[in-house]
Structure formats: structure tokens, C-alpha cells
Amino acid sequence: MENGFSLVPKEEEEEEDYSNEKSEDQTSYYLSTEMMKKVSFMAAPMVAVAASQYLLQVISIVMAGHLDELSLSAVAIATSLTNVTGFSLIFGLAGALETLCGQAFGAGQFRNISAYTYGSMLCLLLVCFPISLLWVFMDKLLELFHQDPLISQLACRYSIWLIPALFGYSVLQSMTRFFQSQGLVLPLFLSSLGALFFHVPFSWLLVYKLRFGIVGAALSIGFSYWLNVGLLWAFMRDSALYRKNWNLRAQEIFLSMKQFITLAIPTAMMTCLEWWSFELLILMSGLLPNSKLETSVLSICLTMSSLHYVIVNAIGAAASTHVSNKLGAGNPKAARSAANSAIFLGMIDAAIVSISLYSYRRNWAYIFSNESEVADYVTQITPFLCLSIGVDSFLAVLSGVARGTGWQHIGAYANIGSYYLVGIPVGSILCFVVKLRGKGLWIGILVGSTLQTIVLALVTFFTNWEQEVAKARDRVIEMIPQEII
């Protein structure tokens, strides 16, 4: 396929592009129309990629929900717990590649990209084993929280059959970052849509026609993740970067694993601590007097917030890619311009989504529930939800900038302080002491998100971008064999 059409650019073209990157016009120090176009063009297909991967589990829940109420409850609980204990952790750990691969690509060190990706796959696959062991005993964990024994057994069964999906997801996230760090979103877009289109009929076939029930719902997710991996592997093999730089030595792989783990732990903390705080919100709502109403309303608000986060997180991914590429290329002004352009786009997203949601605050809740009591309660919380969505728009973009520069440790500390030392305690007081119920819990999360956004915004504003270029250079040099240096 050397002379044929390829979805993956050849290495020679990549080298030429990034050698020219260093000599580009650097007058657009704060905002650049051209940079906003680049971020937008990358973010748009990344929305489809993230949404496609997100919908796989949603579709399986819908399929299980049409079996019976018991199956729906078991799959919903299992999905929540497997996300908290497994998928969120894998997603967070893989985020370290956004720093490592992105800066290596900007510096033209393509061999490093292969080493980091391979090292990431090995690390994440190893992490899957203890997670799988936990899932095998999921019923015992649920019984500790006084869940119904029958629901616990079904949830455990679903979790066990979801283990192949966990391993597929770990490889998929590494490969996703491999392409994302190079700005190659078309392979991601096509493979994700292909997996989604396969998943719908295949899940229906396993669940209903072959009568596998919830086991079929779990297996279909695993098949779809591995299909996505296979499609991306086909695209990767067509890349000159793969053919020339995949024959790695053991020393390179172990060195890449060391660097990966150093960044992966704080990256996972950034992602997981925020993710877990929202799950804790739902658990705390179950302690309220009218727990069914409170949990339903907060679940609806959380679903809407999660759907929005899929969009704005794509802008954060684009910001991460462009910032890391520019730092690796030794271009501090372009890196700052990329960060500012992404933040500006996040501001536009915050305004559009918040205003739209507030304008239809009396109607949108009926998408999720026909109960007027639920819809009225959602209407009361919507102003706080709009504020939360506005803050999340900035937070997702700033988190992307943090991953692109390698500030994950700052984000992790900010998460602990913002959510667990301030946000959740404030929410608990407002909920149980001031008697604001679910509204108080959501205000607490909003306070935590706002504090974290302020911290990351201040760090970004006062950043010495020339110093960040030097750090990126040191990180890249650490992976270059000594005999070459």
C-alpha cells in the first residue's frame, strides 16, 4: 500500500510537517483564528468517537431493560460499579499518553510514540488482572452495602462476562491516544462508528434471539471493543511510523513503562477522583427521606451533564494534542495560543449549552421521565445544572491543557482539595443540615468544580511556556538511546 490511498499519513510527511512547525509565524501569541479552526476540526470528530464508545454500554443497558425490571436493576448497578472500579481507572491511566506521545510527536521522535504506546498496553493489561478479580467477587461487595441478594448475584454475573470488555478497553484506550496525539482523528472516527453500528444488531442478536440475556449484553460490549481495536490495528499497520519504529528493544519498552507509570498515576487521580465524586453524589441521595425521587432527579441531571461532557471533553482532547505537539516542537507561543483558543471555544460551548438548557428548563426533563413531580424538581435544579455545565466546559478544556503540558500532579492535588475537602463536605451540610436535599448535593459538587477550575486557570495563566518547552525536551531526551545522544 506504499503508493495507494492511506488514512494514516506516512512518516516522511509527518517529519516535514513538524520540521516546518518550528519555523511557523509566532505572532498569534494569545488567540489565533487558524488555531481555533484546527482545534474545532479535531474536536468535532472526537465528539463522535467519544459518543460512540459511551453509547456501547448505554445500548446494552437499554437491551437489558427490555428483558425485565430485575435485569435492568442488576445491569445498572453493575455498570456503575464496573465504571468506578475499572473503566474509569483505565481511561485515566491511558491519559498519560496524551503528554508523552503528543510531545514526542511534536519533537519528531516517532520511535518514542511506539515505545510509549506499547508500554502503555502492557501496563494497562497488567492492571486489568486485579480489577477482574474484584469483579469476580462483585456479589460479596454488593452484599456489604446491603443490596438485594438476587440483584447482587445477577450484577456479579454481568460483571464477570464484562471482563473481556475490560481487556479490550485497555488496548483500545492506548491505541486511541496513539492516533489522537498525532491528530489522526479519521481512523478513530471510522473505527468507532463501525464498532457502534456492529454493536446494535449484535447485542440484539445475543440478548433476544440467542436468549443469552444479560450475559449477551455484556459479551456484545467486549466484542465491540475488540472489533474497534482490530479496525484501529489495521489502520496502524498502514502507517510508516508503525513499520519503521515498532521493532523495539526490551530496554526501550521498560524505560517507556517507567515514564508512563510516573505520569499515569496522577492522570488517573485527576480523572477518577472527579468521576467518583459524582457517583458518591448518587449514593448520598439514597440516604434522603424520599430517596426514589432524589436519586431519579440527580441521575437525570448527571446524565445530562455527562452527555455534555462528551462534547466539551473532545475540545479538551484537541487542546491536549495541539499543546503537547507545540511544546514538543519547541514552540511556546503556539502552545499558549492553542491553550487560549481551546479555552475560548470552551467559553462558547458553555454559553450555548447553558442558555439553551435554561430556556427549556420546564420541558427537557420529560425526555427522561413522564412524572410531573420529577420534572418539577428537575426544573428547580436546572439553574445550578446550567452553572455546573458552564464550569465543566472550562474545566474539561483546562484539564486537556494540563494533560498536554504534563501538569497531572497539580490536577490531582486540586481534585482532592476541591471535591473531597471542600465540595463534598459543603454538599453534605447543605443537603442534610440546611435541608436543601438533592439541590444541596449538586451545589456542593458545583463548588468543587469551580474551585478546581480556578486552580487550573491560575496555573495556565501564570505558566512560563518557555520553561514548559524545556521540560518537554527533557522528557523526550530521556527516551532517546544514549549511543545516539
From Swiss-Prot:
GO terms for molecular function: antiporter activity; xenobiotic transmembrane transporter activity. It comes from the Eukaryota. Residues 1-26 are annotated as: Disordered. CDD domains: MATE_eukaryotic. The keyword Transmembrane helix applies. Its main location: membrane. The chain crosses the membrane at residues 41-61, 74-94, 118-138, 159-179, 188-208, 212-232, 263-283, 297-317, 338-358, 381-401, 414-434, 442-462. It is a multi-pass membrane protein. It is found in: Membrane. GO terms for cellular component: membrane. Belongs to the multi antimicrobial extrusion (MATE) (TC 2.A.66.1) family. This is Protein DETOXIFICATION 8. The lineage of its organism: Eukaryota, Viridiplantae, Streptophyta, Embryophyta, Tracheophyta. The gene is DTX8.
